[in-house]
Amino acid sequence: MSSGGLLLLLGLLTLWEVLTPVSSKDRPEFCELPADPGPCNALSQAYYYNPVQHKCLKFRYGGCKANPNTFKTIEECKRTCAA
């Protein structure tokens, strides 16, 4: 294979790595936990990663003592669990 072909292959592999979503083996284990509103009653909007649907979803968060699969923004959820 020519050096140009190798360079093209390397570029395509790099692009593939960047565009490929986080696989379940690279995702933190806490992303598999269910939505947890916690014991408090503030009821604010939060996000959690749903491993069955492979996306971040809204849920009502009580405001305290939730599990680590609880995010203030959908962007934070995606960056951590679904990116």
Curated annotation (Swiss-Prot):
<dbReference type="InterPro" id="IPR020901">
    <property type="entry name" value="Prtase_inh_Kunz-CS"/>
</dbReference>
<dbReference type="InterPro" id="IPR002223">
    <property type="entry name" value="Kunitz_BPTI"/>
</dbReference>
<keyword id="KW-0964">Secreted</keyword>
<keyword id="KW-0732">Signal</keyword>
<protein>
    <recommendedName>
        <fullName>Kunitz-type serine protease inhibitor stephenin-1</fullName>
    </recommendedName>
</protein>
<comment type="function">
    <text>Serine protease inhibitor.</text>
</comment>
<dbReference type="InterPro" id="IPR036880">
    <property type="entry name" value="Kunitz_BPTI_sf"/>
</dbReference>
<comment type="similarity">
    <text>Belongs to the venom Kunitz-type family.</text>
</comment>
<dbReference type="GO" id="GO:0005615">
    <property type="term" value="C:extracellular space"/>
</dbReference>
<feature type="domain" description="BPTI/Kunitz inhibitor">
    <location>
        <begin position="31"/>
        <end position="81"/>
    </location>
</feature>
<keyword id="KW-1015">Disulfide bond</keyword>
<keyword id="KW-0646">Protease inhibitor</keyword>
<dbReference type="Pfam" id="PF00014">
    <property type="entry name" value="Kunitz_BPTI"/>
</dbReference>
<dbReference type="GO" id="GO:0004867">
    <property type="term" value="F:serine-type endopeptidase inhibitor activity"/>
</dbReference>
<feature type="site" description="Reactive bond for chymotrypsin">
    <location>
        <begin position="41"/>
        <end position="42"/>
    </location>
</feature>
<dbReference type="InterPro" id="IPR050098">
    <property type="entry name" value="TFPI/VKTCI-like"/>
</dbReference>
<keyword id="KW-0722">Serine protease inhibitor</keyword>
<feature type="disulfide bond">
    <location>
        <begin position="40"/>
        <end position="64"/>
    </location>
</feature>
<feature type="disulfide bond">
    <location>
        <begin position="31"/>
        <end position="81"/>
    </location>
</feature>
<feature type="disulfide bond">
    <location>
        <begin position="56"/>
        <end position="77"/>
    </location>
</feature>
<feature type="signal peptide">
    <location>
        <begin position="1"/>
        <end position="24"/>
    </location>
</feature>
